[in-house]
Structures are given as structure tokens and as C-alpha cells.
Amino acid sequence: MSSIHSTAIVDPGAELDSSVTVGPYAVIGPKVRIGAGTSVGPHCVIEGRTTIGRDNRIFQFASLGAIPQDKKYAGEDTCLEIGDRNTIREFCTFNLGVPGAGGVTRVGDDNWIMAYCHIAHDCLVGNHTTLSNNTTLAGHVELGDWVTVGGLVGIHQFVKIGAHAMVGFASAVSQDVPPFMLVDGNPMGVRGFNIVGLKRRGFSADRLAAVKQMHRLLYRQGLTLEAAAKAIEELAAEHPEAAGDITLLRDFIVSSTRGIAR
């Protein structure tokens, strides 16, 4: 049987694993599903069609699954999906999706999401990301795996931030940030590549060398994006260990719709 505090309000329609714990004064709605080992802190509100995986830690006053902050939303049956082993700190707000754009806001696994972060409708957050305090994701933002975002950062709607990228404190992000890159400022600029983060993740010398060359081609050679993408693709023969990294960056560049941060 779930450990539910006597002051919590859990709708009979909610589905909670027997190992879920719910703190004082939390409110859980009828369409909510919560997996094994997840803890819900005091005063949390979890509503809408929200599915939460296992072993998540949700701290006090978080609001998950509220309707999107979109004037076009008219009560459609959209959802929020949260994976496993996430830490969601105080006063975080994650909204449902909106129809016509997939209708799903999705957060993956093993993310570290600090206090007062906002994840708006239809955002797609990967795995192993770190969102520092007061990070704000507007609608339809996509974050790749291992992205790190500093505190007080605002990310414009539809922006994509590629895997292993890092965004510095108090930046305003209005264009796509390629994988592996380090950006900072308002207006935002590319300051280099995320070498510290890549080393921490065990990137080999060959992979680091490839990322360094890709950064140079994209930002130091005066090439057009088309020419840079072609030159990056040609690095695969020289750096066989980095073939996946090269494809990741090349595909990100050619698929960008908001323009690449330069």
C-alpha cells in the first residue's frame, strides 16, 4: 500500500504503485500514474494526464501537469510524461502539451532539475540533463542528452539545444545551440566547446580532437553553414571513434529551423 499522508488528497482514479510516498497536503488528480519508488513532497500538485516513472524525487510545491500557458488551449486531452530517476526540486512547473504539436510534454530519465525551473508545453527534455535554478523553457524547446543549463536562463520557443552542450548563467537563448558547444551571454555567443563536460563523460582523445576540429570548422574558418556541414562530415575518415559525434553535429546543423548560434 502506498504511504500517503492523511492530509494529502489523492483522487480514487489515480494509479500509484504501492511503494510511492505522498507528503502532507499534496494533491494528485484522477488521470495521474506514478511508478515504483517515487516520492512526492509536501504541497505538490500533480494533475492532468500525467505519467511519472519510477524512483523520482519530487520536492515540495512542485506543480506538474497543469494546463499549458497557451491562449489557444481549450481543454483538449494532452499529457505530460516524466521518466525515471529524476530529481525535481521546489516550485518547478511542468505543463501539459497542446494539440496540433504532438500534445506531449516529455522529460526523460536521470535529469537534475533545480528549484523554480519551468518546462512549458510540448518541450522534449532528454536524459542526464542539468537545469539550474530558474531555468525557463518556452514551448516546444528540445534539449538533448547531457545538456547543462546555468541559472536564470531563458530559452525561446522552438529552440533546440544539442547533446552535451552547455549554456552559461543568465543567458538568453534565441537560436539553436549545436551539440558539444558552450554558449553564454545576452546577446548569446559561442565561447568554445564544452571540453570540461566531455572529459567528465569519458570522451576519448580522438573524440575530443574531433569536437575541437568541428568547432573550428563551424566558428573559426569563415565557412557558410552548408560548407561547414560538408567539411564536418568529411572528418569521419580521420576520426573513426567520433563517427557518431560527427553525424550528430552534422545532422543538427542541416535540420535547424531557427538558425545556429554563431
From Swiss-Prot:
Recorded source organism is: Paracidovorax citrulli (strain AAC00-1)
HAMAP family (alphabetical): LpxA
Which family, according to the similarity comment? Belongs to the transferase hexapeptide repeat family. LpxA subfamily.
- Tell me its EC number(s), please: 2.3.1.129
Tell me, what does this protein do in biology? Answer: Involved in the biosynthesis of lipid A, a phosphorylated glycolipid that anchors the lipopolysaccharide to the outer membrane of the cell.
Looking up InterPro entries in the UniProt record yields: Acetyltransf_C, Acetyltransf_C_sf, Hexapep, Hexapep_transf_CS, Lipid_A_LpxA, Trimer_LpxA-like_sf
- How would you classify this enzyme at the top EC level? transferase
The pathway is:
Glycolipid biosynthesis; lipid IV(A) biosynthesis; lipid IV(A) from (3R)-3-hydroxytetradecanoyl-[acyl-carrier-protein] and UDP-N-acetyl-alpha-D-glucosamine: step 1/6
Write down the Pfam families for this protein, in alphabetical order.
Answer: Acetyltransf_11 (PF13720), Hexapep (PF00132)
Tell me the CDD domains matching this sequence: LbH_UDP-GlcNAc_AT
Q: Does the keyword Lipid metabolism apply?
A: yes
Query: What is the name listed in the Swiss-Prot or TrEMBL entry for this protein?
Result: Acyl-[acyl-carrier-protein]--UDP-N-acetylglucosamine O-acyltransferase
The protein's assembly and partners: Homotrimer.
The compartments listed are: Cytoplasm
* Molecular function GO labels: acyl-[acyl-carrier-protein]-UDP-N-acetylglucosamine O-acyltransferase activity
Q: Which GO terms describe its biological process?
A: lipid A biosynthetic process
**Gene Ontology cellular-component annotations:** cytoplasm; membrane
Main localization, broad class: cytoplasm
Keywords for this protein:
Acyltransferase, Cytoplasm, Lipid A biosynthesis, Lipid biosynthesis, Lipid metabolism, Repeat, Transferase
From the broadest rank down, the organism's phylogenetic lineage runs: Bacteria, Pseudomonadati, Pseudomonadota, Betaproteobacteria, Burkholderiales
Please give the catalytic activity noted in the UniProt record: a (3R)-hydroxyacyl-[ACP] + UDP-N-acetyl-alpha-D-glucosamine = a UDP-3-O-[(3R)-3-hydroxyacyl]-N-acetyl-alpha-D-glucosamine + holo-[ACP]
